[in-house]
Amino acid sequence: MCEICSIKTSWLPKVYESYEEVGTLLPELAKELGVSDQVKIVAGAGDNAAAAVGTGTVGDGACNISLGTSGTVFISSDKFGVDENNALHSFDHADGSYHLMGCMLSAASCNKWWMDDIIGTKDYGAEQENITKLGENHVFFLPYLMGERSPHNDPNARGTFIGLTMDTTRADMTQAVLEGVAFALRDSFEVARSLGIHIARTRICGGGAKSPLWKKIVANVLNIPVDIPENEQGPSMGGAMLAAVACGEYPTVRDAAETIVK
């Protein structure tokens, strides 16, 4: 690839594991911060990979859903798997195994758009209290407000409501938004399952996870238990855990996850 793109390999940086030390703090920064210049700088990870570590998503079939502005399904696997027909990412995992990751572009942002821009309210909880018929809604919502990435990978996909009638209520449409996001997350689950990965339960974090109703809808749609970690700040916790491994506090990322995450 470097040859095709006329990139010299000497231009490429050294690759580190996410839990490896890459240096120490610059003396001038250490002085400004009032700390030792021997403070280690650790490679770290991107937001979703760090969130997986911080939510204990290690071990075959372990899963975490990040229900934020976008929606991410992160699934750990002991074997490398690729689905050539769907847009799920396949990578190495920090604990030495592999992971699949599906990222939908609009998740909690769909709910924000519906509540803030269409209904015109900031009281999300009050709106959700009007939803009383889970499993009976005849209104459907496709959450493709910004196109889609996983698993459909179509920038031209667009959102829509389906099944509106004269009897449709505001609560029906609010429910449809929450359910539409949940079913879009399920699309990535189904791709992972088609590769032979067994997912028995999942953790969930992110702003959308603060809604008890939405968590219940996700659990119903996926038909598996949904757990809430004690510390819901997955990315920052994951970064701290990777640093702890680099400093020798834990021998491996998996040991850190199994010890710290509850």
Language-model segments: what does each one mean?
Residues 3-4, 27-262:
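Active-site core segments that coordinate phosphate-bearing ligands/cofactors
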Residues 18-22:
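Short beta-strand to alpha-helix junction loop
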